[in-house]
Curated annotation (Swiss-Prot):
Belongs to the SufE family. Signal peptide: none annotated. It holds the Pfam family SufE. It comes from the Bacteria. Disulfide bonds: none annotated. Keywords: Cytoplasm. GO terms for biological process: iron-sulfur cluster assembly; sulfur compound metabolic process. It comes from Escherichia coli O1:K1 / APEC. SUPFAM superfamilies: SufE/NifU. This is Cysteine desulfuration protein SufE. The gene is sufE.
Length: 138
């Protein structure tokens, strides 16, 4: 995740954007920074249901118990939203993920109020899937 900013810098950068067009472009840029997901990880078991776009999220726990998230989408804005979610969950254990509510961060960024209903539903589906996988590991 070295290519992505931390939570605080994400929020600062997001709030510096002058309008929603700039914010969308920033979200897309974040998605472009995600490492490429391996083809074998683009499997039905890693597919997130509830998203209009194709979304894959892979969760692995490293030797220190920290969750490493990897993901991809066939839609640029959705891939950027994946990056935002990954930034918020960065360096967390499974229990940290279960306990952490990302919604206040979305409110600070005024993120969900400018997403279409289908993108908001997809974002919620991603969060539910990550939290469910984390709960199974904790």
């Amino acid at each position: 995740m070295a290519l992505l900013p931390d939570k605080e810098k994400l929020l600062r950068n997001f709030l510096r954007c002058a309008n929603w067009e700039e914010k969308y472009l920033y979200i897309i840029e974040l998605g472009q920074r995600l490492p490429e997901l391996r083809d074998e990880d683009k499997s039905p078991q890693n597919s997130i249901q509830g998203c209009q776009s194709q979304v894959w999220i892979v969760m692995r726990q490293n030797a220190q118990g920290i969750i490493e998230l990897h993901g991809d989408s066939d839609a640029a804005i959705v891939k950027g939203l994946i990056a935002v979610v990954f930034i918020l969950y960065d360096q967390m254990t499974p229990q940290d993920i279960v306990n952490f509510d990302v919604r206040p961060w979305f409110e600070k960024m005024a993120l969900t109020q400018h997403l279409t209903p289908s993108r908001s539903q997809g974002l919620e589906a991603m969060i539910r899937a990550i939290r469910a996988k984390a709960a199974a590991l904790s």
